């Protein structure tokens, strides 16, 4: 037999906190100490450990005969360390000493606790039984000593292997946990790298908006075309028609309408340059810029078609107007010859300064000024009136008649409203006295008189029962 493990503990300033007798055979004691020291020996090596402030709990059980029992000692320190020792077997108990001797599988374990004069001692010893009693008698034999040492080394090696196996198991579990954490980190890093590569391969947003999908372009084009057609129907534009409606050519442009592509082209070029830079003047997005560019392009195409169709309509209208102009001239000469009595020079009847009223008609980018007063007095508007006109224009009763001619061959008559006081172009500034005779009453009853009434709604191109005199006058002048 030999002492395999030894442990010795000594504690100072020990105070018994309490003692509890749970039953006649079960007791519990608790002690507190200020400092202590514990020394352990294993084979040929030992360790020493000191403590400061802690507690000791001692639980022991005794049988009815007080010959058997068990003892458990727990030591706890304020630093968070703890130790425990236990033994079960023969019991030796006194007032200050409690000792247990346990014999199992060739090993004997002894645990002793003593408390006296403020000190507490703990002794823990394990004794290994190697050989039988007859062999112990021959301790002086060399062979026996070699065998004994060999067995001791085997026991030490076994204990060392057990401890190593225990430590390696803990390390293996620790490495397993570390491997799992490392694997998770690697997967997370790979996912981040993959996501970053996908973002690098993805094209820029600007390139995505530069060329929208074909379906989107077709849809935008059809929507723009449909909106333009609806707007043209609402505005009453019918550029392909050449019929006369209430004396006006349907599809003809108003004198105040001007189509100038120069300014729009400048704006389109500016929009294209700004769109190429990725931003618009109003700060719109690329998608909005593309929509505006398509809309401007559609408007430009519509404008070009409108100008081309308007030119064709005007040419056809002029050809028809020329035929009607010949008819108007014949009626004009006939009416003047019938109504003329006195031949005097033609003069302006206006008392105010002569102001030539000029209006513009624009069919393309070319703009030309036309004096309306040169051709306006020679138009008989009743020739262009249709039979279905229900709102006949009223002719004012107050008229002024001037009949004059230098050669006496042709006379002229005018019925001028009070609102138009300008003199005709090409007349002298002299005044001709008004002559009232019997022809005046006859002139009022004639139906072929040439009437120009600025008070009527002739300037309104959209009125159903009116006709644009300025447009007709300008068209006739261009034809002549």
Swiss-Prot record:
Single GO cellular component term: host cell nucleus
Biased composition (Basic and acidic residues): 156-165, 175-215, 225-236
Pfam families cross-referenced by the UniProt entry: U79_P34 (PF03064)
Keywords: Host nucleus
Spans annotated as Disordered: 156-241, 417-438
KW Isomerase (keyword) present: no
Subcellular location: Host nucleus
Compositionally biased spans, kind Basic residues: 422-437
Family, as annotated: Belongs to the herpesviridae U79/UL112 family.
Function text: May be involved in DNA replication.
UniProt-recorded name of the protein: Protein U79
Organism: Human herpesvirus 6B (strain Z29)
